[in-house]
Amino acid sequence: MMDRVAGVHYNVGVFTNLSPDHIGPGEHKTFEEYRSWKGQLFKRCDVGVVNIDDENTEALLEGHTCRLVTYGRAEQADYRETGFELLRTHDFLGVKFHVTGKDEMDVKVNMPGEFSVYNALAALAVGKVLGLPDQAIHDGLGKCVVKGRVELVPISKKFTILLDYAHNEVSTESLLTTLRAYKPHRLVVVFGCGGNRSKLRRYGMGEICAKMADFSILTEDNNRFEKVEDILADIRVGMNKGNPDAKFVEIPDRLDALHY
């Protein structure tokens, strides 16, 4: 939309998934426009590595000019995941799975959930496109951690703390669905929403947390030029919609919220 990468050509472009976001004043008018701009990447790269399972893949790739390499769970995927298994200890959440298709490999990733499987498949496919040896790909995936993405914060063996960037309804639902799969005794979420951004994020995140968390702590998160109290009020609307009986507290000061 702002042509920030105009004139830049890429060796490899990657499509992971897409859902409604960045729609509103100063951003995109519609989801279709948002998707169309995302698709421009595949007119500016030599190879496109794409998630064949995502419902938006076909529309996003309309008019693409690159060679495509696919990954996912569909039988026709070039790199296909099978045998997905959750891994857990007191200080570790991860996954392991088997890859078939153009290559065979057992993969272990030090990050939890289904989305980590898809991200690992994408990274594996990019590695193959770039000609990396299988052992380097295997070892790299086994060591990979991403700051702020389901990042484990080792504080106590009595409970597990994870730090994640989830900032809209879809990413929050994906995260909490992932954590629920590990059957936690109690799931507590501390979160807020950014100011001067679409209110749909606030309603959506509030609704999902009300449905999926055992307890939520609503707090500030870069309010920009809005009042924190106004943002929390919008989140509360979503909470009440998701579950009128949801248990939560509002603590505007983030440090106080973390101490709570």
Predicted regions located by residue number:
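Short, ordered loop/turn segments at secondary-structure junctions
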Residues: 18, 73, 194, 221-223
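Beta-strand->loop->alpha-helix junctions that form or flank phosphate-binding loops
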Residues: 66-90, 108-114, 138-142, 251-252
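A short helix->loop->beta-strand "cap" motif at the edges of active sites that frequently abuts
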Residues: 44-47, 64-67, 184, 244-246
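C-terminal helical cap/extension that packs against the catalytic core
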Residues: 206-260
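Flexible active-site lid/hinge loop adjacent to a nucleotide/diphosphate
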Residues: 1-63
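Residue-level signal for inorganic ion chemistry
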Residues: 16, 34, 49, 68, ...
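Active-site flanking residues adjacent to catalytic metal/cofactor-binding acidic residues
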Residues: 50, 163, 191, 220, ...
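Nucleotide phosphate-binding/pyrophosphate-handling subdomain across enzymes
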Residues: 97-215, 237
